[in-house]
């Protein structure tokens, strides 16, 4: 995988310190670079995004991507944004078609 080629590790279903799981985690040694959660339903999406942000925060991630296949903007004008901001988690909603390119760009920016 592209991560290992440049010194990062990708871990599927990373177990968190409190027993939850993060769908995909990008790590570099002991540093937690990026938590990625895949959401395939628009039902309760705001609450699910908040839960994902709490999981990421509690496990030491400050960057979270929500991979979301729908065209609507689940966080636009949302009460959830304020709570996530207070956690100090940088969150981005990413379309599945953009994930690989965005991961490559993020990791390249961290290496060079």
Identify the meaning behind each predicted range.
Residues 17, 70-71, 98:
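Conserved beta-strand edge residues that scaffold enzyme active sites
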Residues 23-25, 48-51, 106-108:
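Surface-exposed beta-strand edges and their flanking turn/coil or helix-capping segments
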Residues 1-31, 41-46:
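Active-site metal-binding core of divalent-cation-utilizing nuclease and nuclease-like domains
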Residues 14, 39, 95-97:
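Residues at the C-termini of beta-strands that transition into short coil/loop
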Residues 1-2, 27-29, 62, 74-112:
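Non-catalytic C-terminal interaction segments of nucleic acid-processing enzymes
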Residues 33-35:
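Hydrophobic "anchor" residues on beta-strands that sit immediately upstream
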Residues 18, 23, 59-62, 112:
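Acidic-enriched, low-complexity/disordered segments with a strong bias for Aspartate over Glutamate
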Residues 38-93:
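Catalytic cores of nucleic-acid endonucleases
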């Amino acid at each position: 995988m592209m991560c290992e080629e440049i010194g990062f590790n990708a871990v599927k279903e990373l177990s968190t310190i409190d027993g939850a799981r993060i769908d995909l985690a990008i790590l570099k040694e002991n540093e937690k670079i990026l938590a990625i959660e895949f959401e395939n339903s628009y039902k309760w999406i705001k609450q699910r995004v908040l839960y994902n942000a709490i999981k990421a925060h509690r496990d030491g991630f400050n960057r979270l991507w929500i991979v979301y296949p729908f065209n609507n903007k689940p966080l636009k004008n949302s009460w959830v944004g304020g709570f996530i901001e207070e956690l100090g988690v940088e969150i981005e909603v990413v379309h599945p078609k953009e994930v690989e390119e965005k991961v490559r760009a993020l990791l390249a920016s961290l290496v060079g």
